[in-house]
Swiss-Prot record:
This is MFS-type transporter PC-17. Disulfide bonds: none annotated. One of its GO terms (molecular function) is transmembrane transporter activity. It comes from Penicillium crustosum (Blue mold fungus). It comes from the Eukaryota. It is found in: Cell membrane.
Length: 543
């Protein structure tokens, strides 16, 4: 039987947030103006829609999450054709960076916007921006237009995924959300894995522009469902607009955007366009660090009007999920990118075949994600599943790091499945943890924090993995095939190795690739192992 201090899933959503906030000010009934503003979101009794509406809304936002997931990876196989059509090889990195930078820069701001304004209309505006960006990308006659379109889509993406999670919190009680959240996460995960495959199919069979056209009808379905079936959240009309605008923390946002852009540019350019000792990379890190410190000071100064109120970061569950999310998602990102590289380079299969060989990860994520959601709905406790997710992910990552050129299907299927099971357990659960631990009025900001950490993890660990891979590949080639210039291998890409190298050196080249990829997997092993410490920071009785 749960302890008396436990937070019960079926009653948490109905807690009186006003009593909690009042207690912080001496137990009186008069709360500061900004605190009263925060409580406007959920101060009315919660009325959840019927089953049919819940299913339709969940399917609608899941479809949109699928599109957002696709946009993260679908260009991986389309970029060569795009750069060839526009003669824009120098712009190649911006096709990905423009989307990622804008998304990461505005996610936290959308957390505050969802706090003060209608969830329904904020989500629809975000979806409109995403669709507009996709339309521009699909029809643009120039490389510059594609970059602009990607940036606009990134702005919309910043509001879509946190909005999807917040919508779920408005249509279902907490004890029913694990299954819905898992479904959203699974759709996004499937899109991320299948993105390169679809990008290749569209590029080869139709046109790379269909990588963006596909978003338009799917987004249209989501817009119709949300418009007609999601009720508009109530916001008190007596709250002055000036208070809402002030609460969006414009000063913090102006400082935060260049800070995160500088950090992400340093991570993306370091080791790729410039070496890590280059003055440009060093200056970007310095700018990011200085502005980051200034932003933290602004958060302490603004308090309740900050982008992230400091009191939220004093909660163990918020800190724990952040510590958990960065390395956990980092590990998933490493294997999401480098397992296909291992299949295509070492095993010599095509991009579409590597996608099929990646199915054990996808199936493991789907099956365990859904099963664990049902179990959590029954037992209530979340932390044990966070721990188990870290353990399974670390073990699967460790086993994958033993891959050899001769490794058979039993090995890469079984080891991948374990990674998928770990991912299914731990990838989306931090979102439920923060929803269970924070007052209802703080759910939008807390959700945005976790999703921002997921994006940040992708940037950090993709940079780490790229550096490890390139350095180890160059080192292995110098040792195994000293007659071959390592730069020629790095510049030539990871596919078609058997066509580029003679048979007498090909086995050594393949061994060098195997060594480079498995050493990159070590970064994933370390990350998954570190994530378990974040799970232990979370209060055990968060249910």
């Amino acid at each position: 039987m749960p302890d008396k201090g436990n937070i019960q899933l079926d009653t948490l959503q109905h807690q009186d947030h006003s009593q909690e906030t009042a207690s912080r000010y001496g137990g009186g009934s008069q709360l500061p103006e900004q605190e009263r503003l925060d409580t406007n979101i959920q101060d009315d009794p919660v009325e959840y829609p019927g089953l049919i509406r819940v299913i339709l809304i969940t399917l609608g936002v899941a479809l949109c999450s699928f599109c957002v997931g696709l946009d993260n990876t679908i260009l991986a196989t389309a970029i060569p054709k795009i750069t060839s059509e526009f003669n824009s090889l120098e712009d190649m990195s911006w096709y990905v960076s423009a989307y990622l930078l804008v998304t990461s820069a505005f996610i936290l701001s959308f957390g505050k916007i969802y706090t003060y304004y209608s969830v329904k209309w904020t989500y629809l505006v975000s979806l409109g921006l995403f669709e507009l960006g996709s339309l521009i990308c699909a029809t643009t006659p120039s490389s510059a237009g594609l970059i602009v379109g990607r940036a606009i889509s990134g702005m919309g993406s910043a509001g879509i995924f946190p909005g999807s999670v917040i919508i779920l919190s408005n249509i279902a009680p907490l004890h029913q959300r694990p299954l819905l959240t898992a479904f959203i996460g699974i759709m996004s995960g499937i899109a991320t894995v299948t993105g390169p495959i679809l990008g290749g199919v569209f590029t080869d069979r139709l046109s790379w522009r269909w990588c963006f056209y596909i978003n338009l009808p799917i987004g249209g379905v989501t817009a119709v469902v949300v418009f007609f079936f999601l009720k508009t959240t109530k916001v008190k009309k007596n709250v002055p607009t000036s208070h809402k605008i002030k609460g969006l923390d414009w000063i913090g946002t102006v400082v935060f955007i260049p800070a995160i852009v500088s950090l992400l540019l340093a991570l993306q350019w370091g080791g790729a366009r410039y070496n890590w000792q280059n003055v440009r990379i060093i200056m970007l890190f310095i700018i990011a660090g200085v502005l980051g410190i200034v932003w933290l000071l602004i958060q302490c100064w603004k308090q309740e009007e900050a982008t992230i109120p400091p009191r939220l970061m004093q909660r163990r569950s918020i800190v724990g999920t952040c510590v958990y999310t960065i390395p956990f998602v980092g590990c998933v990102i490493v294997f999401g990118y480098y397992l296909p590289i291992w299949f295509q380079s070492v095993k010599g299969v095509s991009a579409s075949q590597s996608g099929i060989m990646n199915l054990p990860t996808v199936v493991g994520t789907i099956v365990v994600g859904l099963l664990s959601s049902v179990i959590i709905m029954k037992v209530g406790y979340m932390v044990p599943f966070l721990v188990l997710g870290s353990v399974l992910l670390a073990v699967g990552a460790g086993l994958c790091s033993t891959f050899q050129r001769s490794s058979g299907s039993a090995e890469w299927i079984g080891y991948q499945a374990m990674i998928g099971m770990g991912s299914g357990l731990g990838y989306q659960l931090p979102l439920l943890v923060v929803q269970a631990d924070v007052p209802a009025a703080d759910v939008p900001v807390a959700t945005a924090v976790v999703i921002f950490m997921q994006n940040l993890a992708g940037s950090i660990f993709s940079a780490i993995a790229q550096t490890v891979f390139q350095n180890q590949l160059a080192k292995s080639v110098q040792i195994l095939v000293p007659s071959v210039n390592p730069k020629s291998i790095l510049d030539g890409g990871t596919v078609g190795l058997s066509d580029r190298f003679p048979s007498d050196v090909l086995p050594s080249i393949l061994q060098a690739y195997n060594t480079a990829v498995t050493h990159t997997f070590y970064a994933g092993v370390a990350a998954a192992s570190l994530s378990v410490f974040g799970a232990f920071i979370v209060r055990w009785n968060v249910t």
